[in-house]
Amino acid sequence: MMRIVIFLLTNLAVMVVFGILLTCVGTHSSNTVRLMIISGLFGFCGAFISLLMSKFIALRSVGGKVISQPQNETEHWLLNIILNQAQKIGITMPQVAIYNAPDMNAFATGPSRNNSLVAVSTGLLQNMPRTEIEAVIAHEISHISNGDMVTITLISGIVNTFVIFISRFLAQLTAGFIGSNNEESNNGNKLVYMIVSTILELAFGILASIIVLWFSRYREFYADAGSANIVGCDKMIAALQRLKTSYEPKVTNNIKIFCINGYQKSLSEFFMSHPPLNKRIEALRYGTYMK
């Protein structure tokens, strides 16, 4: 709840600062005020809808099935491990789901520490020793305990507000500077506005995604450290080493950011949701992020 309050106050502060700056430079108008409100609402609403529906969206994306009543020994074991770790860390027992995928993977999502979901792939259950699965689950439990899913979603909402407002505001200025007031020019102004706003939204959207992905990489180190605190550093290192042999995850990008194995081919680490596995292992060995 505190994160959501901070998010609301941050968005409000951003809009107020923009309003003051625009007034100082003499570009404050009813159109600009309307754009500020629309940008803020899109930033708010998009983030909140994504947050509230995160479990539903995640399950639909991977075809996961929630375990309500365990049907076999593996499901019994999985529920017991997650329950024990949740109690140890002091959070409400998450919902538990299994989804069919060959890669060794797991993810956590949900709107709060006490309303969350942990999902594991069949590939993880079939190909990883249980001691290492415990470490993977502890990694996801740490994400929930740290509130990482909520924070990443709220950061996305804030940067989306910036992207929408700045791109459309600059597009308005460009269209107004190029055009005039006759009818033919007004049609041209609209075209200029659409082209410029689209280009700027794409460009600023890339910059915004770099910010969100940086935060995601940063929090992965702390989730690894949290897992090491719960089950031991050796188990977490062994799990990460085994993930090197896994298939590339087949989940969608909005889910991949929450997976323990977010491997992806990229020209630059800037566009990766997870740090390279070797860096994560090195951080654990040196205790860089251990509390």
Curated annotation (Swiss-Prot):
E.C. code: 3.4.24.-
Entry cofactors: Zn(2+)
GO molecular function: metalloendopeptidase activity; zinc ion binding
Signal sequence residues: none
Alphabetical keyword list: Cell membrane, Hydrolase, Membrane, Metal-binding, Metalloprotease, Protease, Stress response, Transmembrane, Transmembrane helix, Zinc
Membrane topology classification: Multi-pass membrane protein
Enzyme class of the recorded protein, top EC level: hydrolase
UniProt main location, coarse: membrane
Active-site residues, as the UniProt record annotates them: 140
GO cellular component: plasma membrane
Pfam families reported in the protein's UniProt record: Peptidase_M48 (PF01435)
Residues annotated as transmembrane: 4-24, 37-57, 147-167, 195-215
Co-factor binding details: Binds 1 zinc ion per subunit.
Location(s) in or outside the cell: Cell membrane
InterPro entries linked to this entry: HtpX_protease, Pept_M48_protease_HtpX, Peptidase_M48
Gene Ontology annotations of biological process type: proteolysis
HAMAP family: Pept_M48_protease_HtpX (MF_00188)
Family, similarity comment: Belongs to the peptidase M48B family.
NCBIfam families linked: PRK05457.1
UniProt-recorded name of the protein: Protease HtpX
UniProt source species: Baumannia cicadellinicola subsp. Homalodisca coagulata
Gene: htpX
